Amino acid sequence: METLKSKTKTRVLPSWMTAPVDERKVVSVKTATRKQTAAWAQRVGAATRAPATETVYCMNEAEMVDVALGILIEGRKQEKPWEQRSLEATDKLQLSPPCSSSPGSSSEEEDSRISSLAPGLSPPRGPEASDSPCSRSPEEEKEEEDALKYVREIFFS
């Protein structure tokens, strides 16, 4: 065993591992990236301005939906106002059934309103059933329209 310890085994290393390290060749990562971006800026011709910085964000589903709704709202605001009004007017006409002139509606009118609902939707029941769609306050209609507006934008545009 002592004979094994006394002998020192020499390893043959490749030349790139045994070459002396030159101080100028060792460059930090930050300096290398700065040089690369500077070279890129010179090639593009924008050496006078700083390179653009890109930021990447990770979002969960709720944040992504919020951002998407914000983008839709901004896009909607940038559209022509008359076009938006005409779209809202046609949507409102399609969604709201006609109001009856008499306070008591006949059963035929009620049946026609119920049959005009989409399949799978039932008429409102309970205390809300006695209220006609025309007796809603403008605030309630506006809230409902806002909620449906986003759904229409997402699924039908």
Curated annotation (Swiss-Prot):
For this UniProt record, the keywords arranged alphabetically read as follows: Acetylation, Chromosome, Cytoplasm, DNA damage, DNA repair, Nucleus
Sites bearing N-acetylmethionine, chain numbering: M1
| Chief site of localization | cytoplasm
Q: Does the keyword DNA damage apply?
A: yes
**Positions of region (Disordered):** 80-148
Alphabetically, which GO biological process terms does the record hold?
Answer: DNA damage response; double-strand break repair via nonhomologous end joining; immunoglobulin V(D)J recombination; negative regulation of double-strand break repair via nonhomologous end joining; positive regulation of double-strand break repair via nonhomologous end joining; protein homooligomerization; protein localization to site of double-strand break
Where is this protein found?
Answer: Cytoplasm; Nucleus; Chromosome
Which residue ranges does the UniProt annotation give for the motif KBM? 1-21
- Any keyword Oxidoreductase? no
Please give an example of a GO cellular component term from this record: nucleus
InterPro entries attached to this UniProt entry: MRI (IPR028278)
A GO molecular function held by the record:
molecular adaptor activity
Ranges of Low complexity composition bias in the record: 96-106
Pinpoint motif XLM by residue range: 147-157
Give the multimer and partner information: Interacts (via KBM motif) with XRCC5/Ku80 and XRCC6/Ku70 heterodimer. Interacts (via XLF motif) with TRIM28/KAP1, ATM, MRE11, NBN and RAD50. Interacts with splicing factor SF3B1. Interacts with ERCC6L2; this interaction is DNA independent.
- Briefly state the protein's biological role: Cell-cycle-specific regulator of classical non-homologous end joining (NHEJ) of DNA double-strand break (DSB) repair, which can act both as an activator or inhibitor of NHEJ, depending on the cell cycle phase. Acts as a regulator of DNA repair pathway choice by specifically inhibiting classical NHEJ during the S and G2 phases, thereby promoting error-free repair by homologous recombination during cell cycle phases when sister chromatids are present.
What is the protein named?
Cell cycle regulator of non-homologous end joining
Q: Gene name, please? A: Cyren
